[in-house]
Amino acid sequence: PQVYKSIFSNDESSVTTHKRKNLTVFFSDIVNFTDLSDSLEPEKLAQIINNYLSEMTTIALECGGTIDKFIGDAVMVFFGDPESMGEEQDALSCIEMALRMKARVEELRKYWIRNGVKGGLDIRVGIATGHCTVGNFGSNQRMDYTALGGPVNISARLEGKAPVNEILISETTNNLVKGQIK
């Protein structure tokens, strides 16, 4: 919604401008999703993944995040563009979102088990903060509003290293929120 407003506000520069901004980037992924996708019928898989992505989208928007993309079962969200509440608050909002998503996944396990997902679903989360280039990237036929840079790569790597159902944050993010997260 934030990007939509920016693009359709008749501000042509918002469509072509690339900016360097400090962002807090979130990556999550469903553990063993490939195995799950191979074991379920397409309709059941679609129902489960669409339910999951809908629930995560609602939380991301409520927390003020910009949903960058879904890559299969992976979710990328960033804070700090197109609107920023300040580096510290952006990092806090991202962590609040991650904690809410983690809690919601735990609540949804019962639903998923009833719908054929043995043991429910588990996620991993990575969060990193730093300077990114953000804007529209792509070709004449297709553009994506996205963030590029070290924090994007770091958050994806942290997600891959996170223990099941846990959140790993970068040192930079930790320094911004130190003492404010329980």
Which sequence ranges carry the predicted segments?
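Alpha-helical scaffold within the catalytic cores of cyclic-nucleotide enzymes
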Residues: 49-65, 81-125, 150-151, 156-159
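A generic structural signal for short hydrophobic patches within well-formed alpha-helices
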Residues: 4, 33, 76, 173-174
